[in-house]
Amino acid sequence: DQLQSNYSSLKRSKDQLQSSYTSLLRVKEQLHQSYNSLTAERDDFKNSPCQTDWRRFGDSCYIVSTVKKNWESSRQNCIAWRAELVIINSLIEQEFVNGLIDSILYAWIGLSLKEGTWKWVDGTPVTSTYWTKNQPNNANGDQDCGEVLQSASSGEKGWNDERCSADQHFICEQ
């Protein structure tokens, strides 16, 4: 009687394991299909040209706005374009962005001061910095957003902290 009970219990456990295994196989197949689809989508994006007026650099496309907005409105505008305010990851990308601002002098980038730390719009901390001389300086205690600028007097290009409410051009990256 005890043997029969153990056998029944083991059989139930085996059936449950078999059912779980079958479910996991289905999930694995769905994940594999999603992976293949996303990989193809990524490859299509890498090989496709940027939209009109956008410029390709590396794996991303960039655009400088023709209108001026405050930092938050600029970010929302980029999001509406399925992009984000630019996140600068390297010196070569910084040099590319510098080239985008030749005629406008200032543009918002995806950098802001959060709880005393400069962070990118995706929440990552800043690792490399390209601040212009004596920046960030938080003049008047309210410069919590980052911009890329070209100094009209010296021609120096780099980052500057600015009031988030200032209206200026912005650079989106997708």
Residue ranges of predicted features:
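Extracellular, disulfide-bonded carbohydrate-recognition/adhesion ectodomains
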Residues: D1-Q174
